[in-house]
Amino acid sequence: PHLNYNVCSYRKQWKEKIRLGYLGFVSDIKGYSEWKKLIQSLDKNRFDFFYFGSAIEEAESDGAKSVMVDFNCPNSLGMVEQLKKNRIDIAFLWSKCQETYSYTYYEAFEAGCWIVTSTHSGNITDQVLKNGNGRCFDTVEDCATFLKKLQGDIDVLRIDDVKINCNTDDFAPQSFGGENMKYRRGKRP
């Protein structure tokens, strides 16, 4: 053989939580009561909840980290910038009315967020289906079930054995303690 190598494996462990965001006006018609149900039904150790808008105190009392977004305040960052800055993975856009146009959908789309929405959200539903950038659900309970399963699927991907050539220092990963993994044969961080 042209190359002799030893294979060692280590377990990738990512501590990041899935970051969910509610965007815009706090109103039952925009799905805020469903947002609160979602917060209550998902594991806070696996999900971070963010609210983007101007109802900061209410959102924080309901369990979300609040980020001020107000287009009337010229000194504050806009929605797209705040979504990117806070690394939001999934935007929760659960309008109960048949939206004809949703600014928050396009802001979330521009920021690279995946969208979860109701099948009754009108244009939001249409755009998610057209662009393939999210999922539509009949109930918030269905959405919560999907997100719990999604978290489990991500955990499987995140905590997977990675095999490397331990003879090459350049590619040997570092453990969280800074120790070169090639010296930990048979051990896991």
What are these regions (language model features)?
Residues 79-85, 146-150:
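Short amphipathic alpha-helix with an adjacent loop that forms part of the alpha/beta core around
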Residues 127-135:
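Acidic, glycine-centered active-site loop in nucleotide-sugar glycosyltransferases
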